């Protein structure tokens, strides 16, 4: 099942319905164990339109965020002690329902009942330049941020906030 984010696709868009029915008449789903043309084509388009040279497809936002968290942990495992492998997230965020993404989500209502939660996460106020500056330090290895928070009340990042985070990370 897909999450609520798919609602952004609208309702019965003719172009989307046509694409879905054309694909359904060919092949539905094969998992990532088989190479098929549509994801290969999409991967090439994503690489061409971005800074990346690789693509990792996931089934959900939670799975994508979990993979990002694991990548950070694995990448920093040999180079940094455990207390210097922190991931910063923001109040009002929602990153998924896996154990790591629930922990990255700084909302107790989603974390309650799942303790003890994994360590290595820190939280700061969303859109607060000064608090972000205080939170990001030598122990920070990643910043997990939503440009537009949905669960927190449809809160867009203030102008310059994401750029400021990027500068702090550099």
Residues covered by each model-derived region:
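Residues at alpha-helix caps and immediate loop-helix transition turns in enzyme cores, especially N-
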Residues: 1, 12, 157-161
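Beta-strand scaffold of nucleotide-dependent catalytic cores
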Residues: 1-3, 134, 166
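Short glycine/serine/threonine-biased micro-segments
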Residues: 1-3, 8, 59, 66, ...
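Glycine-rich loop-to-alpha-helix module at the N-terminal edge of alpha/beta enzyme cores
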Residues: 2-82, 86
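Active-site-adjacent loop/helix segments that line or gate small-molecule/cofactor pockets in enzymes
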Residues: 33, 125, 170
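Surface-exposed amphipathic alpha-helices with a cationic face
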Residues: 73, 159-170
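PLP-dependent aminotransferase-class I/II
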Residues: 81, 90-149, 153-161
């Amino acid at each position: 099942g897909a999450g609520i984010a798919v609602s952004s696709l609208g309702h019965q868009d003719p172009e989307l319905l046509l694409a879905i029915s054309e694909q359904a008449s060919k092949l539905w789903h094969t998992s990532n164990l088989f190479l098929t043309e549509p994801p290969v084509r999409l991967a090439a388009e994503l690489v061409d339109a971005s800074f990346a040279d690789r693509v990792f497809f996931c089934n959900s936002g939670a799975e994508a965020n979990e993979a990002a968290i694991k990548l950070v942990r694995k990448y920093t495992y040999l180079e940094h002690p455990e207390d210097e492998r922190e991931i910063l997230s923001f109040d009002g965020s929602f990153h998924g329902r896996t154990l790591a993404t629930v922990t990255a989500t700084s909302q107790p209502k989603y974390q309650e009942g799942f303790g003890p939660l994994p360590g290595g996460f820190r939280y700061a106020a969303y859109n607060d330049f000064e608090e972000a500056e205080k939170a990001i330090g030598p122990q920070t290895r990643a910043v997990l941020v939503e440009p537009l928070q949905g669960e927190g009340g449809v809160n867009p990042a203030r102008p310059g906030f994401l750029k400021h985070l990027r500068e702090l990370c550099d």
